Amino acid sequence: MHSQIWVVSTLLISIVLIVLTIVKFKFHPFLALLLASFFVGTMMGMGPLDMVNAIESGIGGTLGFLAAVIGLGTILGKMMEVSGAAERIGLTLQRCRWLSVDVIMVLVGLICGITLFVEVGVVLLIPLAFSIAKKTNTSLLKLAIPLCTALMAVHCVVPPHPAALYVANKLGADIGSVIVYGLLVGLMASLIGGPLFLKFLGQRLPFKPVPTEFADLKVRDEKTLPSLGATLFTILLPIALMLVKTIAELNMARESGLYILVEFIGNPITAMFIAVFVAYYVLGIRQHMSMGTMLTHTENGFGSIANILLIIGAGGAFNAILKSSSLADTLAVILSNMHMHPILLAWLVALILHAAVGSATVAMMGATAIVAPMLPLYPDISPEIIAIAIGSGAIGCTIVTDSLFWLVKQYCGATLNETFKYYTTATFIASVVALAGTFLLSFII
């Protein structure tokens, strides 16, 4: 049995190893996580074959569920992108004269972000911000910051986004419940971290016009876009199916045939599978796309997820090593003796890891590995709440280590100092608000 000092030192060194190899030596996170897994296994006295078996089972067990859902989600997001469905939502909300432009951008980010990776969402939706900025003579920062904050919030707390789905799966949380809680917390965090924060700044927020190099980026002709009803139906269908499953689990007899049917169609894999074929028809065939064209778009979409799948698989390996080496059990005892609330601990670990590594996905996987062992010691706190707490932490501290920081800086034509002052601060405020929302939810449910 290893001493607590040895266990804590091993864990801390493994985290430092991950950060250094990614930030300093430019290792891919997949390799960094695998290296840390071998390091922990060796330091905890695992045999070579035991380490390999744990890594293999960790990768397989994690991707066995997530690979299918992420793949199907990628198709759904790609169809949203190529059909112009995301722009349809933005243009429709733009007509709501009772909403301010910054609130509109939050809603666009939240709704469209459900099916889009955060970086893809920024690239796809920023022309809408450009268009509104030109028409209303508004500072681009007032539009881009709420949009990007909302996209980041959804990315971290709402499945079927890969990191949020990974955390929910590893903690044994109900995915439908996490979706509902995540949307509530994400909306509150985005509105306060975006529009309310910018309103507080007032005239101190500098005016930023659309950068000249992006002046030619335009929103597509509205006549070529799918209808709003078709767009919303496609986005919300898989979420609705998963929520029906959650409701059924609370209210239906488990022996009934209807319950089995609802469990089947509400499973994330089945729900996303159904949604993909609805998207093919509603956003593809009805928009005069051929099956060959949709096949090409699907293949192009799959090319972009190899990176995230490998990172998530390696995160599963790291998690498996922590469990197999008994480090997780000892860590649970140590953390419980710290007398720090598990919600605060989950948030803080994810926040620090995001700042250090620059990837919200890696941060959430690392936080899950650290926090999960102590959950059995707190039966009154649901895994859904801890999942939201981890995601809330990962929203914050979007700094120079994160590619999203540079994307926002480039599109807004902002200086490094301005991006720190306005966007990094916005994400940190959103993260703190999300933490407060998570605590509030924990008292209610």
Curated annotation (Swiss-Prot):
Keyword Cell membrane: yes
InterPro entries according to UniProt: Glcn_transporter
Top-level lineage group: Bacteria
Keywords: Amino-acid transport, Cell inner membrane, Cell membrane, Membrane, Transmembrane, Transmembrane helix, Transport
Induction per the UniProt record: By growth in D-serine, controlled by DsdC.
GO molecular function: D-serine transmembrane transporter activity; gluconate transmembrane transporter activity
Residue ranges, Periplasmic side: 26-28, 78-105, 161-177, 245-257, 323-342
Membrane topology term: Multi-pass membrane protein
Subcellular location: Cell inner membrane
GO cellular component: plasma membrane
GO BP annotation list: D-serine transmembrane transport; DNA damage response; gluconate transmembrane transport
Residues that span the membrane, as ranges: 5-25, 29-49, 57-77, 106-126, 140-160, 178-198, 224-244, 258-278, 302-322, 343-363, 364-384, 385-405, 425-445
Family, as annotated: Belongs to the GntP permease family.
Name of the protein described by the UniProt record: D-serine transporter DsdX
